[in-house]
């Protein structure tokens, strides 16, 4: 990208709230039901029906606001956003416009290094404008109806929290880092399941460019319904290139809504972009103002989980792990809980080795099997015992990997699985000094050339001798003792 242009990005994210019923009706929000089986008279906008606000949706919005340090509006109102679309039976969407329930707040993001561009990793705080409650629309189905469109209203009325940032991001990398941080937070808080394939978390990106140093924003295009982090990055990068090329060729960027085509990896025009006045917002006369007292906020605050940033700092201080390791361990609530359960069983002295195992062997196996840590077949108690056996010298770290693989495959239910497998396979580490000395004497006698090379100053020869000793014991020798005994015998 030309260095004379600055990219300006703001994101609007729709997080589907994890309530069992819809925001203004008692209909179910369960995903995947047969079309139009979860739409009640309120969702269908039948004559005479009235909306009733779901308290659980409000509490989830409060929880989010508290987590980002936002202001919870003591009084907010719902408005009608008027537009016509076949999957919107009322002819308007109930949303919030002038006074949203969550105002302000910020999220700190970690932007990874871009080695190709020579850019180091850095931290940035993205300020939020607002987060407001609204209902989702239904779904138009085009594929199964030749020449027609089917309408499924199961999704109509599903509660959404629309989270809007200030236009403060300056690259696709920053936008993706923000989206990932936001996704992790709403899942951590338990207010959204974060399932992007099912549409529970989707982003709209407002993208514009302007000459470096210019204060006035360029004309923006909005890219709708990006439901993967990869699509978000690709769509923004394409749109930035498109706008720069258009301007440099003498054209003008048009304010419009665009869609991203993942097959062609390009954005295309959908419709001209509406402004707020096009929707004729006005307060919904069927809904009273939403009044949130201080006592309500305090009750929600009392039930808040420990937030990732606070837990990360605690892990550094309490367990002595690095800030990076603490960040990985608190990437999900399930990962953090598993780590603490392992340490509780294995002892705080084994916290660092527990962290190394979770980020190494455990994560590798999870990725290989395509599962999350809450479905791990090795319990925290089982892993803790394995780590204790490394610490007390019963087995080496190398043998522990073999034991762990067996535990994973057999999905054992007994907490003592590690001891059972070690005993059954005869994997106990040889730590008897006399036995090891006898083995090392044999190794030295059989490898006179390596002994000569080591004494001539070749350090690699020493490693070769260690390898021979480990081979002679089938990997069961205590590596540290082998090292010490070899040094002693070689003088």
Swiss-Prot record:
Highest taxon of source: Bacteria
Broad class of enzyme this protein falls into: ligase
Catalysed reactions listed for this entry: L-glutamyl-tRNA(Gln) + L-glutamine + ATP + H2O = L-glutaminyl-tRNA(Gln) + L-glutamate + ADP + phosphate + H(+); L-aspartyl-tRNA(Asn) + L-glutamine + ATP + H2O = L-asparaginyl-tRNA(Asn) + L-glutamate + ADP + phosphate + 2 H(+)
Pfam families per the UniProt record, alphabetical: GatB_N (PF02934), GatB_Yqey (PF02637)
Family annotation (InterPro entries): Asn/Gln-tRNA_amidoTrfase_suB/E, Asn/Gln-tRNA_Trfase_suB/E_cat, Asn/Gln_amidotransferase, Asn/Gln_tRNA_amidoTrase-B-like, GatB, GatB_C_1, GatB_Yqey_C_2, Gln-tRNA_amidoTrfase_suB_CS
EC code(s) of this entry: 6.3.5.-
GO molecular function: asparaginyl-tRNA synthase (glutamine-hydrolyzing) activity; ATP binding; glutaminyl-tRNA synthase (glutamine-hydrolyzing) activity
Family: Belongs to the GatB/GatE family. GatB subfamily.
NCBIfam families found in the cross-reference section: gatB, PRK05477.1-2, PRK05477.1-4, PRK05477.1-5
PANTHER family: GLUTAMYL-TRNA GLN AMIDOTRANSFERASE SUBUNIT B MITOCHONDRIAL AND PROKARYOTIC PET112-RELATED, GLUTAMYL-TRNA(GLN) AMIDOTRANSFERASE SUBUNIT B, MITOCHONDRIAL
Oligomeric form and interacting partners: Heterotrimer of A, B and C subunits.
Descriptive protein name: Aspartyl/glutamyl-tRNA(Asn/Gln) amidotransferase subunit B
Name of the gene this protein is made from: gatB
């Amino acid at each position: 990208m030309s260095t004379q242009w600055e990219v300006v990005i703001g994101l609007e994210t729709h997080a589907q709230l994890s309530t069992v019923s819809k925001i203004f009706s008692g209909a179910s929000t369960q995903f995947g039901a047969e079309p139009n089986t979860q739409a009640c008279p309120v969702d269908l906008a039948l004559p005479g029906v009235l909306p009733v606000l779901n308290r659980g949706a409000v509490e989830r919005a409060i929880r989010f606001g508290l987590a980002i340090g936002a202001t919870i509006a003591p009084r907010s109102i719902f408005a009608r956003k008027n537009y016509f679309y076949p999957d919107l039976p009322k002819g308007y969407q109930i949303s919030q416009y002038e006074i949203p329930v969550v105002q302000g707040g910020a999220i700190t993001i970690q932007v990874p290094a871009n080695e190709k561009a020579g850019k180091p990793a850095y931290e940035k705080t993205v300020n939020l404008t607002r987060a407001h409650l609204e209902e989702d629309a239904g779904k138009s189905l085009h594929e199964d109806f030749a020449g027609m469109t089917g309408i499924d209203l199961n999704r109509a009325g599903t509660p959404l929290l629309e989270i809007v940032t200030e236009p403060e991001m300056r690259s696709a990398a920053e936008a993706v880092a923000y989206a990932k941080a936001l996704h992790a937070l709403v899942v951590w808080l338990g207010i959204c399941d974060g399932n992007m394939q099912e549409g529970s978390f989707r982003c709209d990106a407002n993208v514009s460019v302007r000459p470096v140093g210019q204060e006035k924003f360029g004309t923006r295009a909005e890219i709708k319904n990006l439901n993967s982090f990869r699509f978000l990055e690709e769509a923004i990068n394409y749109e930035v290139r498109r706008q720069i090329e258009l301007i440099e060729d003498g054209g003008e960027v048009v304010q419009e809504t665009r869609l991203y085509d993942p097959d062609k990896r390009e954005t295309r025009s959908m419709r001209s972009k509406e402004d707020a006045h096009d929707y004729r917002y006005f307060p919904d006369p069927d809904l009273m103002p939403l009044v949130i007292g201080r006592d309500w906020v305090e009750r929600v605050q009392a039930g808040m989980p420990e937030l990732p940033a606070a837990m990360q700092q605690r892990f550094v201080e309490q367990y002595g792990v690095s800030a990076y390791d603490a960040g990985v361990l608190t990437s999900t609530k399930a990962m953090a809980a598993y780590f603490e359960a392992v340490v509780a069983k294995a002892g705080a002295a084994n916290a660092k080795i527990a962290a190394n195992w979770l980020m190494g062997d455990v994560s590798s196996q999870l990725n290989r099997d395509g599962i999350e840590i809450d479905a791990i077949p090795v319990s925290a108690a089982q892993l803790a015992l394995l780590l204790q056996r490394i610490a007390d010298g019963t087995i080496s770290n190398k043998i522990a990997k073999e034991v762990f693989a067996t535990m994973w495959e057999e999905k054992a239910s007994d907490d003592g699985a590690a001891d059972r497998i070690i005993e059954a396979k005869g994997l106990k580490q040889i730590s008897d000094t006399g036995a090891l000395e006898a083995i090392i004497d044999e190794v030295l006698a059989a490898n006179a050339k390596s002994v000569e090379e080591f004494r001539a100053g070749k350090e690699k020869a020493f490693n070769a001798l260690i390898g021979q000793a480990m081979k002679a014991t089938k990997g069961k020798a205590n590596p540290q003792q082998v090292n010490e005994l070899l040094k002693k015998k070689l003088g």
